[in-house]
Amino acid sequence: MNTNNRHYHITTFGCQMNKADSERMAGILDNMGLISSEDPNKADIILYNTCTIRDNAEQKVYSYLGRQAKRKHKQPDLTLIVAGCVAQQEGAALLRRVPELDLIMGPQHANRLQDLLEQVFNGNQVVATEPIHIVEDITKPRRDSKITAWVNIIYGCNEHCTYCVVPSVRGVEQSRTPEAIRAEMEELGRQGYQEITLLGQNIDAYGRDLPGVTKEGRNKYTFTDLLYYVHDVPGVERIRFATSHPRYFTERLIRACAELPKVCEHFHIPFQSGDNKLLKAMARGYTHEKYRRIIDKIRELMPDASISADAIVGFPGETEAQFENTLKLVEDIGFDQLNTAAYSPRPGTPAALWENQLGEEVKSDRLQRLNHLVGVKAADRSQRYMGRIEEVLVEDMNPKNAAQVMGRTRGNRLTFFEGDIAQLKGKLVKVKITEVRPFSLTGEVKEFVLV
């Protein structure tokens, strides 16, 4: 297979797991001798790593595919690939909609990209969506950053939330071994990466599928145990993780995060609704009271911790009173950031078949009201930063102001300040905050952090 001077382009939709998968696939393509291109129209291989969590993301994929399919009629050597969750959900049915596709591959097959492409280059139209056991990552990803990195620790999800397609498209939970995770982190530390985010669809379920139990009767390998195991990896100064499920977010985990200095004081814990009846209909497995207790314990042990979450409005049957319970939870907790969405029926999920669907006008109104409250509460939360000294890991130049650099605090707050990116990139800097906004900060350099 001659890959000389052939270019590839990857467009990624959706979550951090997809972004991590795209980095792994880019690494495979690099190893094959292909060259990355920012412009899809100059690429010989186009890969769309897709998301099906909401309908608008899925429709955007089809729009992009339509344009490239037309191009393929003029350029038959163009290779079109759909990877990720839309590929897994639709499978071979995608060929009826876009017959120009060369390769359809589910997320479990990301590490097989080279083998699958070789089949394509041998003249085959390939569909790879069958469930497989995910082997340990052996391909060096082409990471988008040289400072922060994602490390997958668990794939798939065993939950059955009634609105969510993730279990059907990403498969059952498969945890990587602690040894493999630490080995990858050690290599990243040697390469100079200072911040690592551990990733999983349901990260605090890590280890449930690994063999062994302790004398106390719990799983031998838990996410809490993993944090202790990897915490002393040389070179890595910050550890984050996402995404957590309230059902499995234990006090033991909270105490570990408070005890381990490299673990950042930022927790992303989706609540989805503030109403217990809706949470039961969603099959989330917890109450709003339990969720509040988790946040209370975090703030008891780490008073300055940042809390972010996800919420859905307009779930089938949601009454105005139930929506107001969500508003009350947001008002009471005061999130630093909240990812909000109007409910979007997804094929193959129980909730999509229910008759009590809400109209788009109602969903839009509730989403606007929730977003307004989120902005107000985030602005309130930001006030605590004014005048404080915050540790910021510098990641890049401010794209809107070349005189400024930008990075994130330990609490994940985006922060801008004047500086030379050539000198500061990858540095931990003490910054005095001089201006606050709902979701970002501005400051001035006080000192460098020696690590």
Curated annotation (Swiss-Prot):
GO terms for cellular component: cytoplasm. Belongs to the methylthiotransferase family. MiaB subfamily. [4Fe-4S] cluster 2 binds at residues 157, 161, 164. SUPFAM superfamilies: Radical SAM enzymes. It is found in: Cytoplasm. The gene is miaB. It catalyses: N(6)-dimethylallyladenosine(37) in tRNA + (sulfur carrier)-SH + AH2 + 2 S-adenosyl-L-methionine = 2-methylsulfanyl-N(6)-dimethylallyladenosine(37) in tRNA + (sulfur carrier)-H + 5'-deoxyadenosine + L-methionine + A + S-adenosyl-L-homocysteine + 2 H(+). The keyword Transferase applies. Its main location: cytoplasm. Residues 6-122 form the MTTase N-terminal domain. The lineage of its organism: Bacteria, Bacillati, Cyanobacteriota, Cyanophyceae, Oscillatoriophycideae. Its EC number is 2.8.4.3. Residues 143-380 form the Radical SAM core domain. [4Fe-4S] cluster 1 binds at residues 15, 51, 85. Gene3D superfamilies: Methylthiotransferase, N-terminal domain, tm_1862 like domain. Keywords: 4Fe-4S, Cytoplasm, Iron, Iron-sulfur, Metal-binding, S-adenosyl-L-methionine, Transferase, tRNA processing. GO terms for biological process: tRNA methylthiolation. This is tRNA-2-methylthio-N(6)-dimethylallyladenosine synthase. Its cofactor is [4Fe-4S] cluster. Binds 2 [4Fe-4S] clusters. One cluster is coordinated with 3 cysteines and an exchangeable S-adenosyl-L-methionine. Pfam families: Radical_SAM, TRAM, UPF0004. Catalyzes the methylthiolation of N6-(dimethylallyl)adenosine (i(6)A), leading to the formation of 2-methylthio-N6-(dimethylallyl)adenosine (ms(2)i(6)A) at position 37 in tRNAs that read codons beginning with uridine. GO terms for molecular function: 4 iron, 4 sulfur cluster binding; metal ion binding; methylthiotransferase activity. Residues 383-447 form the TRAM domain. Monomer.
